[in-house]
Amino acid sequence: MKFLDILLDLLFPRRCIFCGELMEEQGTACKACEGSLPFREETLCSETMEPLDGLYCALSYEKQLPRGITNFKFHGKSHLAVYFSQLMMKKMGQQLRQGQFDLIVAVPMQGSKLRKRGYNQARSLAEQLSKELQVPCSGCLKKIRRTKTQHELSGRERRSAQKDSYGCEVLHGEKILLVDDICTTGSTLKECARTLKAAGASCVIAATVCKTPNHKKTMQS
């Protein structure tokens, strides 16, 4: 190990993004957390998600995952997009490669939040997937209306808040891979898909790192 690496380890000890434990080896997660990640058995969600043409989610938002996602979104750790995109490719890379997408589009973030956070985690994921899949990453989708923070709203409030809150450049029949970090009710993804199709997309399939556990047979929002 180089002197600089030793110095960095002393100043900034490596901690698991999930449990916070110190790690002796290089990496993002400790072996215990890495070995117990809540991967979904089926990555393709069976819920009715129109106007989405499909939704793929790699993991379930439970156990240790919420802490890792929180670190990624709110604690300035944009570099974790590399790690989470690798988890997505590990679980559903074959399906995404077979998708033959024309563009990869991230769920956009409103300007005030972007300025405060410094990055859009969905965009960071989309850029990493763009490299993996060799598909262009487009910024054609924009947030045009300010909305409340989603986790503060009920399912019905989320649907109402998202309505007409996005805009998109003119498209010409492209097949789109829509990317976000988490699917909760699906209202954001569905509104983005509606906007993309209204702009001319022929097909919109979404992919997220994780999805909140759903104990009902169909989504209510």
Q: Would you name each region that the model predicts?
A:
Residues 1-180, 184-221:
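Glycine-rich phosphate/pyrophosphate-handling loop used in enzymes and phosphotransfer proteins
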